[in-house]
Amino acid sequence: MKKLLFSLSLALVAFLASSCSDDKRDAIGRTEIVIETSRGNITARLYDDTPIHRDNFIKMIEEGVYDNLIWNRIVPGVTIQTGEPTQKAGGAAPTVDASKFRHTLPAEIKFPRHFHKAGALAMCRQPDDVNPDRVSSGTHFYIVSGKKYDLGSLAEVWQGRRDDEPGFKLPSLSAYQKKVYTTKGGAPLLDGDYTIFGEVVDGMGVVESINKVPIDAEEHPLKEVVVKRIRIVKR
């Protein structure tokens, strides 16, 4: 037991001491969008260093793909998800030909620059066993609601990923990332696995409200929450 506690202490010390030598902050781009939901508006900026995802998202907005969709999955304390073109509010018929929007996007994963802090905007994807290149869905996206961590639990998350994920090669979290995860929260279990292409700049209260909606065993909301539309307000 003493040996185990000593090993854990060493891991925690190493975790606390680590930091990226190049501690870059997220580069917020020029494009600003507003996601109008039945619970209020969420304003986000799209990153310029993930241009494929940014341009695709703009195109999907302009095509009306997200109009009147439901938030179809909620993971409490982690994410809210939408983007399935066939899942309209009230069971309405799709307004677009969903078969035209089954495309994928090459990964633009920019960890550690972009990480899963609260408010991160990212595209969903199929799991590694069928998608080793981590290509993204062309329409399905999620927003991180997340939770706050203390430094000890963050260290445990990172060590757990090293132990459980074959080929785990992510660098240790930087001092900046630790500060964000302990003060604002996020979902570090997802870091390095998905393309983050933007972040919420206003409306996190709406994100948190949606994340608290009761769900069934498959993480589907028991009460319908709607994306009325997404509009571009600045480019």
What are these regions (language model features)?
Residues 11-12:
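Repetitive helical segments and hydrophobic/amphipathic motifs
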Residues 1-8:
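Bacterial N-terminal signal peptides that target proteins for export
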